[in-house]
């Protein structure tokens, strides 16, 4: 016991100094983070589908969220059952709102774009349409030929641009990007899914415009079977965001 008392006394000052340094570092980090985010004015957004259930968009908009992408369609015969209510309600808030569709490799590019156009209104102030390009199912092991997919994408891009007056964005992951988009369609902005790094990098002449950095965020304001929500960040500050999507 006496030895313990002696050890505590001998080490008391260094321990207290260490604790003090730790506290200072914690406070410094908190202040740095606040300063960094306040000055960078980062622009955060969510993307949702029917899996999030009924969404209170006012509540979503009050949690530091600036934009939202809503699932609209898949292929040529599927519309997300909550798209219309989500679109209408989200546009009543101060959020910038856009829609996306999931690509079906078994159907034509032009037909899929037309089906999206049929279901997504052309309204001023909306974000550009998004083409969600991901390998799925059996295509994960046996990807479609690059020529086929590039022809499909070309049809989609041209059809959407003609209707909405702006180049669509392509959402994708690294696997699909490297398969079809690296060194191709360099005029098209990329929305990259990367939940494992702190600085996504794209090869082949592209810069990302949006980065999906988390698929497991929990926010207030929705009640669906999916408790998590996807989080995204714009590649720039609020000034750049407003300039790009005025």
Residue ranges and their predicted role:
Residues 128-204:
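Catalytic domains of cell-wall/extracellular-matrix polysaccharide-remodeling enzymes
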Residues 24-41:
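Membrane-interface motif at the C-terminal end of an N-terminal transmembrane signal
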Residues 1-27:
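N-terminal Sec-pathway targeting helices
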Residues 38-54, 71-157, 161-163:
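Substrate-binding cleft of extracellular glycoside hydrolase catalytic domains
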Residues 43-45, 66-67, 96-98, 126-130, ...:
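Structural preference for beta-strand elements that scaffold enzyme active sites
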Residues 40-53, 58, 185-186, 190-246:
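Functionally critical loop-and-helix segments that line ligand-binding/catalytic clefts
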Residues 77, 106, 177, 199, ...:
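Flexible, glycine-rich phosphate/dinucleotide-binding loops
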Residues 60-66, 74:
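Membrane-interface segments at or immediately adjacent to transmembrane helices
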